[in-house]
From Swiss-Prot:
Catalyzes the hydrolysis of short-chain aliphatic amides to their corresponding organic acids with release of ammonia. Also exhibits in vitro acyl transferase activity, transferring the acyl moiety of short-chain amides to hydroxylamine to form hydroxamates. This is Aliphatic amidase. Its EC number is 3.5.1.4. Thermostable up to at least 50 degrees Celsius.
Amino acid sequence: MRHGDISSSHDTVGIAVVNYKMPRLHTKAEVIENAKKIADMVVGMKQGLPGMDLVVFPEYSTMGIMYDQDEMFATAASIPGEETAIFAEACKKADTWGVFSLTGEKHEDHPNKAPYNTLVLINNKGEIVQKYRKIIPWCPIEGWYPGDTTYVTEGPKGLKISLIVCDDGNYPEIWRDCAMKGAELIVRCQGYMYPAKEQQIMMAKAMAWANNTYVAVANATGFDGVYSYFGHSAIIGFDGRTLGECGTEENGIQYAEVSISQIRDFRKNAQSQNHLFKLLHRGYTGLINSGEGDRGVAECPFDFYRTWVLDAEKARENVEKITRSTVGTAECPIQGIPNEGKTKEIGV
């Protein structure tokens, strides 16, 4: 793992993350014009970072947040489509891979269903090699149709890559799912705003450590008339330490190299902190000392996960007992979100 140079090697993947200024757009024509700006940025960045194998742009960087629902549906994209064609050409021209945001992607039943919040991974030949739909939209604000699975794709130089989006990253389950599928780099594209800056920086570092994985975060910056975005795009090592991190500057770029051999060596040979291995070989030292074999315990010990898999409605019922039974709350009502219909009494 290296930081400070502009190169890469046969063993390292050069990764750039961008603090892209959050655009405020309203029409398809504006979206296309902005996509061309992103494409120009990709080509320009490769001139300055000749080792760049992968560039990552934030959630909402292509379209911005469409606060008007009619605009959201009108600008929803097909994949492949005009936007991805622009990005594909840039990746070919720059001989680099890229991760780009489409907010949103037309639902199969468009316009009767809400669009998806989608990322695409495009290789240096201009091919879409991964399309990920955000599994956990940022409710109650985001109105995207939820996706349903994560993916792992062999990326530049064979590095295995998963994509996740913004609020996905607040749930340890999604990181673990990607890592257990073999991801060596988890890319988190986000359009995260204040006040959650410290929490999001902490979460990315903790999940890199907990899952023995590289993490690349690309976050928005600037003010779009509604939210202020804190940037801090970063590349994080599989030991949870930051290799490179932006500040809050608009269109800031950070760059680092991640070693393919180092992460594979760690996952094979690390012992006390090999979290992926130890989770499925629990207590192996104690079982060896007890004459019960040398592989530890594989069975899942967590009741919540067993219930969720075997009876999802029961798991939902259980969580509502410790939270609430409606998606909204009357103490802070949001238009269009049902709540329990009670109003908080002053002083209670």
